[in-house]
Amino acid sequence: MNSTDIIANVTKPFVENLTLGETAFYISCGIVGTVFNALVLWIALTYINTEDKPRQIIVINMTVADLLMCIVYMKTRPWLSHFNLWLCHPYYVIIWTCQMCSCLNLVWLNVDKLIYIQFPLHYYQIVNRKRLLWITAATWGGLYAMNIALVTFLKITRGSCLGVSLNPYVYLLSPIFYVVMILTSFSLSALIYCIAHNLTHMEERQRSKLFRRLFFLFSSTLWTFFTCLPYRLLYLFSIFCGETCQINNYYKTATNLFFRLLIVGIMINPVITIWTQRIYRLRLMRMFGRLRENSSTEVLMVSNRRASERPPEHTPLRCDM
């Protein structure tokens, strides 16, 4: 990200002396992102039964990662140069881990849907809450350990957390990870779309429900692809082209522009979750009094409902995520 631009062993933000507009951009994105991510997280933890809907654990992980980014990075970026030096290493560990975790969980979400499409009768035998909790622990723990290892090579060179040095060959793993995860998610989504589109045994009504069920996945994957991948690719290429890219004003402007888009993308992620997933949307409408008392009771009271006692073979497809 902006705070981790490590090229030719030197990390330097795009703009060290932020203007009023840039400060307002970071703070406003941080506040809006915090509010919406906290709202999604509250709804998920309060009203969703993860025994019945284990895939929501993945959504919760993505939301937590984005929430931490909004709080730890966006709201503090204008004052990063004033941080105590002992905060620099934990700061980079947190923001790197959160970004990687968000990308990796998008891959898990695609894998989950691929299993659902390929093995619908055995989905709940393959995917369950316990397994996803183990995957969650392994994902966060593995990425945290990897970034702890990365920051051991980090050196503060300019007296603030804005000026740090890291061997580009060591840090190369990070941008490659982002690009590979995003392309993997996009490829899996394309595969899922092709499989769903070519299902011949489904009636039109069933097919429509299936695609509504997949809408959140496709929206999240495409949004990440267009808001995150351009910056990651430009950054990865800049490591190899070195001084040529650093002195090219057009390249720097494009990189700066796509970085801003990445920040906006993180802020909008929870909005996409609310917009595309029925349970979040209905609960939010209920909170603002726009839903009648007797509407969609089953969806709004998910937490009070037992997990289905029917075997997975007889569990129908649902389109409420």
UniProtKB/Swiss-Prot annotation:
One of its GO terms (biological process) is positive regulation of intestinal lipid absorption. Keywords: Cell membrane, Cell projection, Disulfide bond, G-protein coupled receptor, Glycoprotein, Membrane, Receptor, Transducer, Transmembrane, Transmembrane helix. The keyword Magnesium does not apply. Glycans are attached at residues 2, 9, 17. Residues 46-55, 112-132, 197-221, 276-321 are cytoplasmic. Residues 1-24, 77-90, 154-175, 243-254 are extracellular. It is found in: Cell membrane; Cell projection, Cilium. Belongs to the G-protein coupled receptor 1 family. This is G-protein coupled receptor aex-2.
